């Protein structure tokens, strides 16, 4: 009762309970209502009333009148509730919703006039197109508008998520299949609510969601309430059949009569058409002929249309003017006899005249036709010929079932599907010609032997890596861009053995971390085969670019030399990766004068040395190869080749677990890198100890050349005071095992028990502190070396903010060390053997995108988790972090109702003004402000191809395309302009109502808000080197396959089409 009787039930009745005084109105006799009637109190009131009636003051009498009025109101409310099926004061009773204003039914003319006025306003163009192009009747137009309004309310209110999420379906309208038969488009429109005379109208935003078959998935929308037109009864079906027959007949008529048909249907007034809509005398005579045909027509369907359109059953002839008025045709200069003659002739010929034009069918030159008919036919032939050149739809044509071929650009031929991460192969691989390795780079020898020819120069289609190494050798695969083969003389290598060793792929873009290493005895012994001290060649001096200054060329700075590598150790890098992620290598002219160019020095026993001049720039002494795979950029420094007598260090393990993640940094900064095994050398320190004689090296050696471009990933610099052994980290672009790195790059692990590993760095050196690599970061010089769980900081120009805009802090697996400066004689110990990453830790799941633990940060080259979503997800607020994989009881995150209309707010993925990534992740104390540890959250919500292919159009701030007005020469609506109810049927009377939300009315009326929205032509579109595309700009070229811009309609099968609306004369003035 509360909801129906409202707030005013207790107005001015402080003494009476609700529902009393019912007896005074006599209501309890007719309809006492289920309300609690307090009979006793009201009876007492009735007994006292005759006595106190005269003593009542004026205010009491007014209160009594108000009470009687409220009783009347209550009775009306009760009856209304009973009629609507609601009984008051019942449990679980939800009263019906009543609109706040009176809704008066509209006639079609009001809406038509409003649509015609809306054409003038560009922001109302879509609504007018909806009304005028599809020709709905009033009921269905209102149904369309109410459905759009319902969807607007749903968006503003948000999903009513009940337990289990069954209350409101959150439809993400994407599909992994390439051809999905249903697409949705939205059009947003600012209008006023339809109230009479715009009194009290509210400005609302209409967002209509329309479906079109075979339409592109233009935008991710939430579904409006699926509105189904009311089923047509038998009378409606008769009416639809009549309308369809009239449209079919109209399609056969000549164009001039079709135009009069449409004018009469549009205006509904014969006088208006006669006096205002016909320009020439020939048009007036055509109107007279049309009226003659209508007056004698015996087709019930045409009669029904005509009388329904003009509004009465007695057609009047507008040329019969009232007697005191000069008729309109006389003012136009047409005689009465001409009009009567044309009218009678059309009456005799009937409906066939509208199709043939009045003349005999096969005889265009007959003399029997009148003069006006002859002239009319000549011009009509011209019009029809020009009409045929316009696009039209034949009434008997098959309906379009797919997009026309002209709009379908060819989907590029798919390459063989491969995994987007380098796959380790720990078994022998026979070389095949099948190009299946799509992302893992060619891991073949730099030497292409006659029995194993090198791959062809096809960077776009890399071949399956065939790892063939000598028996004692491991392959450290470092990727370089293609280089020209060099003419160097060297003895051919021993025959390669087919044993595939674990390879560490280290390059600019990806860091592959070796987790499990099982070193065998043979590898340990081969690692100890170092060249004696006398064979260590003095590395040449190079002065590099502006980032590194002459501090690297200080002769006192020595560099622990590495044993030389055979040419078939196969350092190579894919040209694709180099092209994409690396700055172009410095040309020989940029690297400095010819005296400071890198010189390749071989040991004395090698034989002839090759000096790399600036013009030739050979990287190493290697036999000429057929492919460009083994050459490094000239800026990365030399590679020293050893004679085959000096056995190579075999550091490759047998079991290698690799993990790749895409580099998020844009440019590389810092000096030259080394292989991963020298970086991880501290593991084998107790096993491989060198004799102390080879651990020292003459300090006269000068530093080998560094790269002239700065490294892409660097570690925290540490001041090397004393004779600490610098552990050379492999910088991600290095090709050479003998490259030095500046000591900004030397990670040193502090553990008091483990001695320094000198086996891999046989020469000690005292490195004076060089100048800072990055100006303005002097504080980094004094910080400690990273602890094992440390993740490397990013350069300040590209901070890595975590997946959703949170700074990645080191995993809680390792305790952060307190920060303190290094004292003078401080020696940083190596990684302890206790922290050896054994085969049981960490275990990675099969999916390399998903890892739930924080163990990855224990690897030195780790640079943060792989971001599992596109860089601009749609809902960026902090609580919408969906779990990366659906769990039990997974419910959707909270709803942000304004995100549907507002541009997204970028938190930290764009890298503009957010907080920078902390350069000292190990300085975060445990008591600091709590940060979200995203590394422990599983990282994929949906499969990756779905996320990449359905990147929402909000993911990048692209300009929204305005809603285009529709050209007039559009294919016609499939229904009559007045009463179609979106139902197509043939003349036999069977109706096939097409659901408007699956219909094609939106084809002309609306265009997608975002023309650049991606279309999932395949599950995975245009990926970068690993995983889905990072930005919508990268995919926008490849995804403009099926756009929704084409003005092609899909019509119901049996709708009879005409070509009137495609004409040039279709504007009605």
From Swiss-Prot:
It is found in: Host nucleus; Host nucleus matrix. GO terms for cellular component: host cell nuclear matrix. Residues 381-391, 507-524 have a biased composition (Acidic residues). Residues 543-561, 1032-1048 have a biased composition (Polar residues). The keyword Heme does not apply. The keyword Phosphoprotein does not apply. It comes from the Viruses. Residues 1-75, 353-708, 733-776, 884-932, 1008-1069 are annotated as: Disordered. Interacts with host CTPB1; this interaction leads to gene repression, but also seems to interfere with the repressive function of CtBP pre-bound to DNA, leading to EBNA6 mediated up-regulation of many host genes. Interacts with host MYC; this interaction enhances MYC stability. Interacts (via N-terminus) with host RBPJ. Interacts (via N-terminus) with host histone H2AX; this interaction facilitates H2AX proteasomal degradation. Interacts with host TP73; this interaction inhibits TP73-mediated apoptotic pathway. Belongs to the herpesviridae EBNA-6 family. This is Epstein-Barr nuclear antigen 6.
